[in-house]
Amino acid sequence: MNILDDLKARGLVYQTTDEEALYKRLESPMTLYCGFDPTADSLHIGHLLPVLMLRRFQLAGHCPIALVGGGTGLIGDPSGKTSERTLNPTEVVQEWANRIKEQLSCFLDFEGVGNPAIMANNYEWLGTINVIEFLRDIGKNFSLGSMLAKESVESRMSRGISFTEFSYQILQSYDFLKLNELYGCEMQIGGSDQWGNITSGTDLIRRMSVGEDRQVHGLTVPLVTKSDGTKFGKTEGGAVWLDQDKTSPYKFYQFWINTDDRDVVKYLNFFTFLSIEEIQGLAQEVESQPEKRNAQRMLAKEVTELVHGVEARERAEKISQALFTGGIANLTAKEVEEGFSDVPSADVEDQEMLLVDALIKVGAVSSRRQARESMESGAVYVNGIRQTDTTLTVAQLDKIESRFIVIRRGKKNYYLVKLV
């Protein structure tokens, strides 16, 4: 099967240049690229779709280039932005670029036989560029009218856009040209907001290769949306990162398992490597047995394992199951730290402290009276076990690896006692 057929079946193709020519070209191996600017020290799930697109092309026998924007990251892409980006110091951007390189290595095979992926950093050519030569040889191929007409620029004109960000599309176009010259790269892929920058690159290569048979292509993926109208990739706690130190595998797993029924089939197509037939089967279950949430569980399993590995995925599933069944006592200290990293907590040194007082210290209740009433009514659980004895001390309670006590008051309010 031509990879374009699979991508279209999954809804992953938003726009392409000359689709017929691209389809024919993809019948044999080709080199393509996608760029990732280091705007933070980690990629987030908004980057996941294009990253997985590179992986899909590699699995189909093509050669992907992951381009880290060590140079363009110093400028800032205006696409999709309503205001000027904050410019970061060079050393910070290069440090972030190195961390992003490490993350990309988890998704692509850079040492495989036949079609190993290529890692590049555009700082290699943008960092040493000669301004006069660049304006003479590259700048003359861009008309001000076409640059102003690009959506990423036009949408910012009323609010103001600096020459720095205005020139970004020229730099991205130059990247495509350099990768074409260095590696024979014939296609750039990106999000739908990158269409203007991508076509600027194809136009530049065409103008720079008059008389040569150099045909290049562009492909964009759709914007990932949520049916409830909220922004994809954002939670109450902020962005969902691919770095487990910024978003734990458990929180990452929870993001996917909480997917709306209206979105889950789309996300299975976008973010997993399950076959179209497997996804169709899960889609039928969403219609006939939505309460089982099998599609959401499969989505969370596949994406968490893809990003964080089998062990982290199993740990996330274990924490989720413990919270659902009340089996907190079966968790390890590491799992407790991961699963309860953002609940109210307090350090307790005196293990002779009454549980009633520990409830006050972690913020579960505001007074001893409220603590006693909550316990006597059966609303307080310690490590999954209901506690009604108001005379209990911390020392008398079971602990997780002698380090933690997990308190639940009511159905969903959790608190963590850390023994020090």
UniProtKB/Swiss-Prot annotation:
Keywords: Aminoacyl-tRNA synthetase, ATP-binding, Cytoplasm, Ligase, Nucleotide-binding, Protein biosynthesis, RNA-binding
Ranges spanned by the short sequence motif 'KMSKS' region, renumbered to the chain: 231-235
InterPro entries: aa-tRNA-synth_I_CS (IPR001412), aa-tRNA-synth_Ic (IPR002305), Rossmann-like_a/b/a_fold (IPR014729), S4_RNA-bd (IPR002942), S4_RNA-bd_sf (IPR036986), SYY-like_C (IPR054608), Tyr-tRNA-ligase (IPR002307), Tyr-tRNA-ligase_bac-type (IPR024088)
One of the GO biological process terms: tyrosyl-tRNA aminoacylation
Limits of the S4 RNA-binding domain: 353-419
Annotated disulfide bonds: none
SUPFAM superfamilies hit by this protein: Alpha-L RNA-binding motif, Nucleotidylyl transferase
Residues holding L-tyrosine: 33, 168, 172
CDD domains: S4, Tyr_Trp_RS_core
Localization, UniProt: Cytoplasm
Record-listed E.C. numbers: 6.1.1.1
The keyword Transferase is annotated on this UniProt entry: no
Entry binding sites for ATP: 234
Catalyzed reaction equations: tRNA(Tyr) + L-tyrosine + ATP = L-tyrosyl-tRNA(Tyr) + AMP + diphosphate + H(+)
Main enzyme class: ligase
Placement of sequence motif 'HIGH' region: 38-47
CC per GO annotation: cytosol
Entry GO MF terms: ATP binding; RNA binding; tyrosine-tRNA ligase activity
SMART domains, per the entry: S4
Assembly notes: Homodimer.
Membership in a protein family: Belongs to the class-I aminoacyl-tRNA synthetase family. TyrS type 1 subfamily.
Function: Catalyzes the attachment of tyrosine to tRNA(Tyr) in a two-step reaction: tyrosine is first activated by ATP to form Tyr-AMP and then transferred to the acceptor end of tRNA(Tyr).
Protein name: Tyrosine--tRNA ligase
Record lineage: Bacteria, Bacillati, Bacillota, Clostridia, Eubacteriales
